[in-house]
Amino acid sequence: MKFAVSSKGDQVSDTLKSKIQAYLLDFDMELDENEPEIVISVGGDGTLLYAFHRYSDRLDKTAFVGVHTGHLGFYADWVPHEIEKLVLAIAKTPYHTVEYPLLEVIVTYHENEREERYLALNECTIKSIEGSLVADVEIKGQLFETFRGDGLCLSTPSGSTAYNKALGGAIIHPSIRAIQLAEMASINNRVFRTVGSPLLLPSHHDCMIKPRNEVDFQVTIDHLTLLHKDVKSIRCQVASEKVRFARFRPFPFWKRVQDSFIGKGE
């Protein structure tokens, strides 16, 4: 089996990366950073996001597994003292994969109707470069509202525990193929009105965001911050691709949520 290891870059993570590589090579596995079948992410959720984007062009051929070396990583199943157990599992145990939905973001520009396509594992946020964001929000081709406020966040089910949660959005189980639209500090008064609640859009619905005046946007795709100029529209929907995580032992989604936000309790 071909593998690659991605590290956060700190001393602890780099040391673990070297150990994991050495152990797996001892089991006659092949280190291949271009076309790995499994990618071990050592660090936190940011490290896994980096690995996801690096291999986003081969998601149907690559599975991910996380080892967290700092605070609890939401995407990580393993801790540093378990790496020998993890290596044995990778080398000796047939694993199954779980698939999570992704967010597709298509930015269309006025010039020649040019398009750029992105995939997000967690979320996409859209903000104006200066002042409030003013944009029409269309759902499934129909005008839903004109938004005025700080910005908009569109998240995946697995990303619903990240920025979306801080905005008051719901936590969605990743077995549900949907995206969530949450508002950032919307302006609501007698003149301007928005729905004021997060919206859950199924896989056959898309969300189109069209600027009313400002055409330069700051768009984030997970950990990436991008400046887009002369934007005509931004379309978001559930992607056809899915991310695959290698599972060597049960770790239910709601258990992850409990451990991350509530703790184990007494």
UniProtKB/Swiss-Prot annotation:
Gene Ontology CC, one term: cytoplasm
Main location: cytoplasm
Record's keyword terms, sorted: ATP-binding, Cytoplasm, Kinase, NAD, NADP, Nucleotide-binding, Transferase
Record keyword Transmembrane present: no
Amino-acid positions noted as binding NAD(+) in the UniProt annotation, renumbered to this chain: 45-46, 122-123, 148, 158, 161-166
E.C. numbers: 2.7.1.23
Needed cofactors: Ca(2+); Mn(2+)
pH dependence: Optimum pH is 9.
Transmembrane segments: none
Temperature effects on activity: Optimum temperature is 35 degrees Celsius. Half of the activity is lost after treatment at 40 degrees Celsius for 15 minutes.
Protein name stated in the entry: NAD kinase 1
Gene source species: Bacillus subtilis (strain 168)
